[in-house]
Amino acid sequence: MTTTEVAQQLVELCRHGKFDETHQTLFADDAKSTEADDSMGPRVVQGLDALKAKAVAFQAGVEEFHGVTISDPIVAGNSFAITWSVDATFKGRGRMTMDEVCVYQVKDGKVIAEQFFY
């Protein structure tokens, strides 16, 4: 898959709530994920199993999702970016909206790195 195809598929899956499927189909086994800070867990994790565990931990911290908005991707070379807005009630933290920019790197048709800015 091209970077554009990976980007479009990631956005489509996420818009339909198929977050687990993104890891299984679009990410490399040694993919790296970098958060802006460590307020919700480790700042950096590497490896598909670690990325999946991070996603499970995030979802476990949510009492209720009220809405998710994901932009169309902007693609340049082997990278793409999307904006992501999550309106959710978090356990022990209340309801909040999180806005972030997500940047992904693609190699050989798989996401090898993701980084979040918020």
Task: Please describe what each predicted stretch is.
Residues M1-D30:
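Short acidic-aromatic low-complexity motifs
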Residues Q24-S71:
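A solvent-exposed, acidic/Ser-Thr-rich amphipathic alpha-helical stretch
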Residues F27, V86-A88, C102, Y118:
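Short beta-strand segments enriched in hydrophobic/aromatic residues
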Residues K32, G94, K110-I112:
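Residue-level signal for well-ordered, solvent-exposed loop/turn and beta-edge residues enriched
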Residues V68-I74, S85-V86, D99-Y104:
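Hydrophobic/aromatic beta-strand elements that line small-molecule binding cavities or substrate pockets
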Residues A88-T97:
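Short, cysteine-centered beta-strand-loop-beta hairpins and adjacent loop/turn segments enriched
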Residues D99-Y118:
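Short beta-strand edge/turn micro-motifs at domain boundaries
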